[in-house]
Amino acid sequence: MVPSSPRALFLLLLILACPEPRASQNCLSKQQLLSAIRQLQQLLKGQETRFAEGIRHMKSRLAALQNSVGRVGPDALPVSCPALNTPADGRKFGSKYLVDHEVHFTCNPGFRLVGPSSVVCLPNGTWTGEQPHCRGISECSSQPCQNGGTCVEGVNQYRCICPPGRTGNRCQHQAQTAAPEGSVAGDSAFSRAPRCAQVERAQHCSCEAGFHLSGAAGDSVCQDVNECELYGQEGRPRLCMHACVNTPGSYRCTCPGGYRTLADGKSCEDVDECVGLQPVCPQGTTCINTGGSFQCVSPECPEGSGNVSYVKTSPFQCERNPCPMDSRPCRHLPKTISFHYLSLPSNLKTPITLFRMATASAPGRAGPNSLRFGIVGGNSRGHFVMQRSDRQTGDLILVQNLEGPQTLEVDVDMSEYLDRSFQANHVSKVTIFVSPYDF
């Protein structure tokens, strides 16, 4: 058994490597001596790694202590910030107002937040932002109803009253109110002779299913029932998920391009173009399935600037190269940048969590004891809020309806702190493809 103590192993090597001549028969062989040396080298390497890790941790602690001491003035600083109110028509998350504690805000459906969604208590006793408030959303302000439809406001929703000949939740579809294109008046397919019988000197007539009796007695005719028009009226259930086409005595449902009709003949299902046998995207790009279509993406890392550069470690992630020891600005840039793509239907019910950001510590290493989440970029910040769901997780929440087709981008940030000292931050760039349909 080889001693585990480095000192004991070293003494053993000295004794056994150079014995007295008369005891040479008890010496270690060359192979045994080399094996013992290798074990000692491995042991020293492990000790060196643990020592370096301890030094790094001690430096971090000393830097945090230096920062906290430097902030202390001659007078005692406040240990808490003023109380914050819950916004009218909104909610507040967080009841502690001590230094470095966070408070988050969100609004009820039908309202949007004006002001910061999160604030942090600073050591000087002030918050990082003003008290936010909730403002009512006018769902009709974007004029969502098409083709002369009238918009009616609702709570976090709207309703379109369509003019004759139009249908759909935004009056975007043309209702089939007459015979198909190419037919002529009196087409026998849409008007048929009734079946009549003489009963007790009176004539009784009836029509096949899907037709109704029209006209005066003795001159009646069976006219087609336009189910698409009948069930397209306000308050009646929809016959079709997408578009309804009237047919003689019945109807059929159609789906838009990029969708297939399911076995029930009414529902539509998106076709995933990205799983076909033949690739649809050029080499070097990745196919992202969207509602009724697809996108070919190839995200790129930020260009290098000065002593800051990034390397692509996977198709959807970039990592920052190590920073020079004296470069403080470099360390405050994102350590990792990841890319994410989501496909959503129009008019998705809100609020709903779309994306989740979290951290986990490597085994044997001290992880961050404080995380801060926020929205740091994008083209539609007002549609989203970033809210902490637990100590290690932040949720990106959609709080306003999205009307397609459109593409939204939002950048979310997670910053790590150890004993109030900044360690690193990570950015996730989320791209959202909104389809023109609500299915």
UniProtKB/Swiss-Prot annotation:
PANTHER family: EGF-LIKE DOMAIN-CONTAINING PROTEIN, FIBULIN-7
Protein location: Secreted, Extracellular space, Extracellular matrix
Domain Sushi: 79-136
Function: An adhesion molecule that interacts with extracellular matrix molecules in developing teeth and may play important roles in differentiation and maintenance of odontoblasts as well as in dentin formation.
Keywords: Calcium, Cell adhesion, Coiled coil, Disulfide bond, EGF-like domain, Extracellular matrix, Glycoprotein, Heparin-binding, Repeat, Secreted, Signal, Sushi
Gene Ontology BP annotations: cell adhesion
Post-translational modification (record): N-glycosylated.
Annotated Gene Ontology cellular component terms: extracellular matrix; extracellular space; focal adhesion
Residues annotated as glycosylated: N124, N307
Recorded superkingdom: Eukaryota
Coiled coil: 28-53
Species: Homo sapiens (Human)
Leader sequence segment: 1-24
Protein name: Fibulin-7
Cysteine disulfide partners in this protein: C81-C121, C107-C134, C140-C151, C145-C160, C162-C171, C228-C244, C240-C253, C255-C268, C274-C287, C281-C296, C301-C318
Pfam families: EGF (PF00008), EGF_CA (PF07645), Fibulin_C (PF22914), FXa_inhibition (PF14670), Sushi (PF00084)
Subunit-level organization: Interacts with heparin, FBLN1, FN1 and DSPP. Preferentially binds dental mesenchyme cells and odontoblasts but not dental epithelial cells or nondental cells. Binding requires a heparan sulfate-containing receptor on the cell surface as well as an integrin.
Family, similarity comment: Belongs to the fibulin family.
Alphabetized Gene3D superfamilies for the sequence: Complement Module, domain 1, Laminin
Residues covered by the EGF-like domain: 136-172, 224-269, 270-319
A single MF term (Gene Ontology): heparan sulfate proteoglycan binding
